[in-house]
């Protein structure tokens, strides 16, 4: 979807990335996931949060890549980092030691209590239903797995999530909890030795959701320009609730769009050159 905001044209994907970038503030330490989180975190670094410290799972600290990495092992991350440490040090000292302000994650599937699934799709959720022909042992789709996301969700002081909005991704109950949000009933973190408070915001291409302070169920707090309540309801696999005071997300600025598009153009050019080399 493309939106026209006076003279600015932008896509729903650009809206999502820029909104996610705005959630990051200056002088915070962010443990970044690959994909959409990395895109948003680097846009933040290149715009309003130049002093944000980006950390990747491979052990790169305060990295400032000129192009987006394809994986946590991308050489661009090491070349532009202040320093690198071992993976055990990254997890045991930095993450488990409570030094990470924000964990920035993506996912294949998310439920109403912000639990994430990147392990298996064991049912067909496209129409909001379940297909019993599939299971964990015989999944419809087997996904890459959790990587460092379970540890990030447990130990980062708070977690940001960014994911495209559809009934396939936003399901009432995830097929498998790879990364805990608030558990199956919203109380799953209460008896766990968590350092962090869990997910604080979910940014999609349609809206912003935040956990209810009491129930921990995700609630829509802001609609992106051009998005209606009906759009969100139609794309969500449960009876989603809306905040009494519903905001409209500010549209991307010309500067934000320029930075994002230049970053993606540099990335495409660099990776294309690698493929032909």
What are these regions (language model features)?
Residues 1-15, 149-157, 164:
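Short N-terminal secondary-structure initiator segments
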